UniProtKB/Swiss-Prot annotation:
Family from the record: Belongs to the ZapA family. Type 1 subfamily.
Protein species of origin: Citrobacter koseri (strain ATCC BAA-895 / CDC 4225-83 / SGSC4696)
InterPro entries: Cell_div_ZapA-like (IPR007838), Cell_div_ZapA-like_sf (IPR036192), Cell_div_ZapA_eubact (IPR023771), Cell_div_ZapA_N (IPR042233)
Alphabetical list of Pfam families matching this protein: ZapA
Subunit field text: Homodimer. Interacts with FtsZ.
Gene, per the UniProt record: zapA
Protein name in the entry: Cell division protein ZapA
Length: 109
């Protein structure tokens, strides 16, 4: 489906952005999150310049995204290592089973 114009409010300013209808709720949640971050920053830093607040919020969000990407990379690497270890364990068990079968002459079919 094609994007449709949506009006949102960011820190007291109206913005019209194009958004697919199925992503409208997510856009509104993102706008609410950004508004909350800007309000929190304004209180915490006592910065009143909106442009400066927006840049600080953007840096914070970018930092959080970078951290999450690193976590995802680390998790994926950990899972790959566990899968390799599991695969080696299974292969070794199959080899050992084959050796046991050869020694005893049993067949597990």
């Amino acid at each position: 489906m094609s994007a449709q114009p949506v009006d949102i409010q960011i820190f007291g300013r109206s913005l019209r952005v194009n958004c697919p209808p199925e992503q409208r709720d997510a856009l509104n949640q993102a706008a609410d999150d950004l508004n909350q971050r800007l309000q929190d920053l304004k209180v915490r830093t006592r910065v009143t310049n909106t442009e400066q607040l927006v840049f600080i919020a953007a840096l914070n969000i970018s930092y959080e995204l970078t951290q999450e990407k690193a976590k995802t990379r680390d998790y994926a690497a950990s899972m790959e290592q566990r899968i390799r270890m599991l695969q080696q364990t299974i292969e070794q068990a199959l080899l050992d089973q084959g050796r046991i079968t050869e020694k005893t002459g049993q067949n597990f079919e």
